[in-house]
């Protein structure tokens, strides 16, 4: 077997045997991590989420692993401008609850959340007082329609609809007993 297939096999067999024998599963994971070191291969961050590289326990989220994201503090970085606060890198901290081993994986810099200044200016120009009034009117109309729907869906609305159906049925039926007896 080539190296990647062997590592993948060890990981899958560790996951399958955990329910039967956790110690055997731990042995397979420790063997996988020792082969990674022996072959001088880089450990994929996704691989570190499967099991602990120190004790070999298979991670079950909420039972024997604790994950959290850690971001750099603004106060610790004095060389940054105020606008670059959101560009600080974050790390994923993996804490094995079996052996208390902590491993950090860099997640990189998060994407910018704010819009560009040109887009903000264009948005401000597009919004004028007339559009605000129109939006208020449409919001008011939506509330009125919602109230009407709630009234119609209530008990009184159901009874009113049933009365209307009965009236329509009476007016359109030509074979009622009153209609038949009235000419006599």
UniProtKB/Swiss-Prot annotation:
Residues 154-184 are annotated as: Disordered. Pfam families: Rpr2. Residues 170-184 have a biased composition (Polar residues). GO terms for biological process: endonucleolytic cleavage in ITS1 to separate SSU-rRNA from 5.8S rRNA and LSU-rRNA from tricistronic rRNA transcript (SSU-rRNA, 5.8S rRNA, LSU-rRNA); tRNA processing. It comes from the Eukaryota. GO terms for cellular component: cytosol; nucleolar ribonuclease P complex; nucleus; ribonuclease MRP complex. This is Uncharacterized protein C16C4.19. It comes from Schizosaccharomyces pombe (strain 972 / ATCC 24843).
